[in-house]
UniProtKB/Swiss-Prot annotation:
Keywords: Ribonucleoprotein, Ribosomal protein, RNA-binding, rRNA-binding. It comes from Hyperthermus butylicus (strain DSM 5456 / JCM 9403 / PLM1-5). The lineage of its organism: Archaea, Thermoproteota, Thermoprotei, Desulfurococcales, Pyrodictiaceae. GO terms for molecular function: rRNA binding; structural constituent of ribosome. Disulfide bonds: none annotated. This is Small ribosomal subunit protein uS19. The keyword Protein biosynthesis does not apply.
Length: 144
């Protein structure tokens, strides 16, 4: 665990979540960490992890071992309802948005949020120039 913490940027080590440093959060038992989370996330984790969430955690632990060997690993997942835990910090997780996998670099500030929050499912609408018969305003445009 110590080796992995040394690979993180120094400003991440100063980060505090509800008064605890990242190192303290990693050493903390899961049931004690769950008590620090907001109600919605706390209830979700107390009900237990789904099979898909357990598989994702297993993939994340394997990816972290590969990171220690110097390999860059991106974990792909469809599990948007997984809560970001301290052990995920520093990894890149590609979250599926319904069309493609959006890479999300996990930072300490993301702890306690859902993965799906960082992979929007809808694009923002960008309206183009109105053409003929596009809107009512084109009724008064002279045809060529």
């Amino acid at each position: 665990m110590k080796k992995w913490l040394e690979t993180l940027p120094p400003e991440w080590k100063k980060f505090r979540y509800r008064g605890y440093t990242l190192e303290e959060l990693l050493a903390m038992p899961m049931d004690q960490f769950i008590k620090l989370l907001p109600a919605r996330q706390r209830r979700s984790l107390l009900r237990g992890l789904t099979d898909a969430q357990r598989r994702l955690l297993w993939k994340i632990r394997k990816a972290r071992q590969k990171m220690l060997q110097g390999k860059k690993v991106v974990v792909k997942t469809h599990v948007r309802d997984m809560i970001i835990l301290p052990e995920m910090v520093g990894l890149t997780i590609a979250v599926y948005n319904g069309k493609e996998f959006i890479p999300v670099k996990i930072t300490p500030e993301m702890i306690g949020h859902y993965l799906g929050e960082f992979s929007p499912t809808c694009k923002q609408v960008q309206h183009g120039e109105p053409g003929l018969k596009a809107t009512r305003s084109t009724l008064h445009v002279a045809l060529k």
